Regions:
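Short amphipathic N-terminal alpha-helix
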Residues: 4-11
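C-terminal capping region of solenoid repeat domains
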Residues: 13, 18-23, 35-75, 82, ...
Length: 477
């Protein structure tokens, strides 16, 4: 990751002139579109003929990932012309104001993509971090022009294309015969018709994400699962999906990641996953599915064996209580990451149950958890922090809690467990599930290294005294 904001504009090109021609992959955390365009634009020297143009900086780049202020036609065209070996292009912008036409992406810009025919992976995303904004100057025609040059594309991710309809998205599915990964975010005109004739295509999709696409219904999923080799299915914030969608998903034998956040599913609907799907799932998220109760735990796990599940997100479930977590602990699911933030009925009993849980007889209490997020759970008190000490949760590396409970206790816990990252300001722990599915940006859940093990073994026996003092001191004030 490279942060271009550390350099003045006139020094930026000088820095990259020193870069090795062998550099093949580059990720820049932030750069302005103007600086990038100037960097990659070929120039003609004072005594140089137009036929002898300076070769592009970074000629060997194959993978380019950029976060910019605005994705523009000029920038896209410059990248497409100048980087002749490019196979992966990932562009994300975060506008502060609504872009003018000269600082925006239009149909013309899409037409310039993949001029050298080597591009396999394309991602164009407009973030709404600062304001609600879209690629308003791109419509179905732009997608059609792009698809003509991208028939060999394997992965396409599009976010914020509010003028693109079913016609544009279907063009991608029918033109890109090698496509295996499709990601659409905030496709406000995307409907069930996009997937209506999936069985008529030659596609073998393995990764599909359609997030914030509120016109999709259960019928879309019934057609989508004709791709029986699906491994990742991200349906977050598609509010019209319900139990019938889960019933359709239940036929997928290779599904590894399923994200259903904010959907209209119920406890009984989750029971469709028991058997074929739950035994293959590695990651499951049902965050914000308001109809779910404690019964969803039994619907998923009771009577299930040899589970591969490592990551479970049951956050923001108003009807999930300690009883559900007690059942989860009883089922001995070998989870590595458990997120249950903002559950008002979750309290100290849940932490005690997880701390006491044994996945198998040869490992310690609560030994499988590397990440635990209990931020803003309504029933968490100082008592829970006693169960976050050693020897409980020996592998825990990430903990999310509410800092207002007792700052001194949190600070003492951080000092006594120096290899535990404690987040107390509502930070989301871990990474985006979509990226996790690709194993490109895996979070650091490593086992103890040799130095860490030596330090832990050498700790004195009274290491918890600070936490005891932190609990007593507030009572004496």
């Amino acid at each position: 990751m490279f942060d271009a904001s550390l350099f003045l504009r006139h020094n930026f090109a000088r820095v990259w002139a020193l870069a090795s021609e062998k550099l093949t992959s580059l990720e820049i955390g932030y750069v302005s579109s103007v600086m990038l365009t100037e960097l990659l634009s070929p120039s003609v020297g004072p005594h140089q003929s137009p036929t002898n143009i300076r070769p592009s900086i970074l000629p060997g780049i194959q993978k380019l990932s950029l976060s910019v202020d605005y994705i523009t036609d000029t920038m896209v065209g410059t990248i497409s012309r100048g980087l002749m070996s490019l196979t992966h292009l990932d562009l994300r912008d975060t506008p502060l104001i609504e872009p003018r036409v000269t600082f925006d992406l239009t149909n013309y810009g899409l037409q310039q993509i993949n001029q050298h025919g080597k591009l396999k992976h394309l991602s164009l995303f407009r973030s709404q971090e600062f304001m609600i904004t879209y690629f308003r100057r791109v419509n179905d025609l732009g997608i059609l022009l792009m698809a003509d040059k991208c028939t060999n594309m394997e992965s396409i991710s599009l976010g914020g294309f509010c003028q693109v309809t079913d016609t544009g998205f279907k063009t991608i599915l029918h033109s890109c015969s090698s496509l295996y990964k499709l990601r659409v975010s905030r496709g406000i005109h995307l409907t069930d018709l996009v997937f209506h004739d999936m069985s008529a295509t030659s596609l073998c999709l393995t990764h599909v994400s359609v997030r914030w696409c509120n016109l999709l219904t259960n019928h879309a999923i019934k057609n989508l699962v004709s791709n029986t080799h699906l491994k990742v299915l991200d349906l977050r914030d598609c509010k019209n999906l319900g139990d019938e969608a889960l019933k359709a998903i239940s036929i997928l034998p290779e599904l590894k990641n399923l994200l259903m956040d904010g959907s209209d599913i119920s406890d009984s609907g989750l029971s469709y996953l028991k058997g074929r799907v739950i035994s293959s799932l590695v990651s499951l998220s049902v965050r914000g599915c308001k109809r779910l109760t404690d019964k969803c735990i039994s619907a998923l796990f009771e009577g299930s064996y040899k589970l591969e599940l490592q990551d479970l997100d049951i956050s923001n479930l108003p009807h999930l209580s300690d009883n559900g977590v007690l059942l989860l602990a009883k089922c001995r699911v070998p989870i590595s990451a458990l997120r249950m933030r903002q559950c008002p009925l979750i309290g100290d009993t849940s932490v005690m149950a997880l701390a006491s849980m044994q996945v198998d007889e040869d490992r310690g209490h609560g030994s499988s958890l590397h990440l635990l997020d209990i931020y803003n759970c309504g029933g968490i008190t100082q008592l829970a922090f006693r169960w976050l000490r050693k020897p409980y949760f020996p592998k825990l590396r990430w903990l999310g809690v509410t800092g207002s409970i007792n700052r001194d206790i949190i600070d003492a816990l951080a000092r006594n467990r120096p290899f535990l990252r404690v987040a107390s300001h509502a930070e989301e722990l871990g990474i985006d599930q979509w990226d996790n599915s690709d194993s490109l940006y895996m979070h650091d859940y490593d086992e103890l290294d040799e130095l860490e093990q030596w330090l832990l073994e050498g700790e004195v026996e009274n290491e918890d005294e600070e936490m005891v003092d932190a609990e007593i001191n507030p009572l004496m004030l």
